[in-house]
Amino acid sequence: MTELSAHLPQFQHGQMTENFPDNHLSNTNDNSERRRHDNSERRRNDNPGSETNGQPQNNIQQVVDQDEEEDEELTLKYGAKHVIMLFVPVTLCMVVVVATIKSVSFYTRKDGQLIYTPFTEETDTIGQRALNSILNAAIMISVIIVMTILLVVLYKYRCYKVIHGWLIISSLLLLFFFSFIYLGEVFKTYNVAMDYITVALIIWNFGVVGMICIHWKGPLRLQQAYLIMISALMALVFIKYLPEWTAWLILAVISVYDLVAVLCPKGPLRMLVETAQERNETLFPALIYSSTMVWLVNMAEEDPEGQRKASKNSTYDKQAPANQSQNEDAEADDGGFSQEWQQQRDNRIGPIESTPESRAAVQALPSNSQTSEDPEERGVKLGLGDFIFYSVLVGKASATASGDWNTTLACFVAILIGLCLTLLLLAIFKKALPALPISITFGLVFYFATDNLVQPFMDQLAFHQFYI
């Protein structure tokens, strides 16, 4: 911009004039300069579209083409790259759940139900079972809706400390209590003898490191691993304590609710995302899995505006002595731009004079000085609830399909296909989209189709020893 402004003509009273350094030149020289200037103006008038703001249009077109190519490269890079970076954690979460369901009988044994599903499905008639499952699903979805609205209201009114405490308590339960139960059942299944002191040390280290990585700072891979683990633990709890028909109904209804909550103008999840974007804040890492690092430090401040102003003032105070020292250094070391160099430049192109018109013209030029998004902030973000319900679907399919791997793999592939289509729509519409509807719909269709059509067909083929 500095080099470009040196060649900008001055616009005064609607006429284009230039200042030349030699005021002692004769009238003949002045006339010759005027003639050359008039000839240059005629050439510009003959080619009116040749220059714009001192830049040829060909160069501008090249810059636009380069920007478009860079945008396409970024779309491909941060599109396909982050699709793969989301496939891996979703796959890992579902693999952990399925492996646990297949090996640890504790999570397939019916020992009770959640308090949110009070109606039992152990009934004499199918109609009564269907009614009880509908009531259980309605209560569960109502609890989810109320909790979501409460979270949005707290975030809307900047109750960050309340939300943070809520999430910390939830993380403590998952990382310590449910992890202790999970580890104990795994040791029982594989007949591993372990004393309580060693188990306590393992759980303590696991939980403390997880709390630090999730709610403060930690390596990206470690944070992602903990988010995957707590999602798998929560999914295992749902798989164990949700009745079969209730679980399928909840999955169907939660996908519809996710669609409404994200896409409706007054949907709670949409309001949450829009509020975070308006405040230029990241959502809590305990709620969101990101393919890039998300740290949460100093969000729970009572007056973020005042904090921002104070930080700006402190920045200016710190920059003032630095600028003074830089000026002193510039006087001692001119970096090659000495007085002789400036005089030679003035002799070649004339003195550079700044006027309000020239400054306005320079400021009107396109600038690339806008703050670009930090590479760490790029990436696709997926809610932990999506991980949980994906894993619940695959885990329930694995637990209730009589040990059939075909149904489990069909649901697994269906969820990944739905996630891929969701990310494709995300790249097209470039706004927050629900991740559950497509994947859950495909998963439910594949589950019932495979369990009721494909598996009996394959059993008959195996019975009659037919090979296709």
Curated annotation (Swiss-Prot):
Q: Where is this region: Disordered?
A: 1-66, 306-378
- Residue ranges annotated as compositionally biased, kind Polar residues, are 12-30, 48-60, 312-327
Write one Pfam family the protein is assigned to: Presenilin
Task: Name the Enzyme Commission number(s) assigned to this protein.
Answer: 3.4.23.-
**So what does this one do?**
Catalytic subunit of the gamma-secretase complex, an endoprotease complex that catalyzes the intramembrane cleavage of integral membrane proteins such as Notch receptors and APP (amyloid-beta precursor protein). Requires the presence of the other members of the gamma-secretase complex for protease activity. Plays a role in Notch and Wnt signaling cascades and regulation of downstream processes via its role in processing key regulatory proteins.
What is the official name of this protein in its record?
Presenilin-1
Give the organism the record lists: Gallus gallus (Chicken)
Similarity-based family: Belongs to the peptidase A22A family.
Compartments where found: Endoplasmic reticulum membrane; Golgi apparatus membrane; Cytoplasmic granule; Cell membrane
Q: Which GO terms describe its biological process?
A: amyloid precursor protein metabolic process; amyloid-beta formation; apoptotic process; calcium ion homeostasis; cell adhesion; intracellular signal transduction; membrane protein ectodomain proteolysis; Notch signaling pathway
Q: Which GO terms describe its cellular component?
A: axon; endoplasmic reticulum; endoplasmic reticulum membrane; gamma-secretase complex; Golgi apparatus; Golgi membrane; membrane; mitochondrion
Cytoplasmic compartment ranges equal 1-83, 155-167, 218-221, 274-381, 430-433
- InterPro entries annotated for this entry? Pept_A22A_PS1, Peptidase_A22A, Preselin/SPP, Presenilin_C
Q: Which domain of life is it from?
A: Eukaryota
Which Gene Ontology terms cover its molecular function? aspartic endopeptidase activity, intramembrane cleaving
* UniProt cross-references to PANTHER family, sorted A to Z: PRESENILIN, PRESENILIN-1
> SMART domains from the entry?
PSN
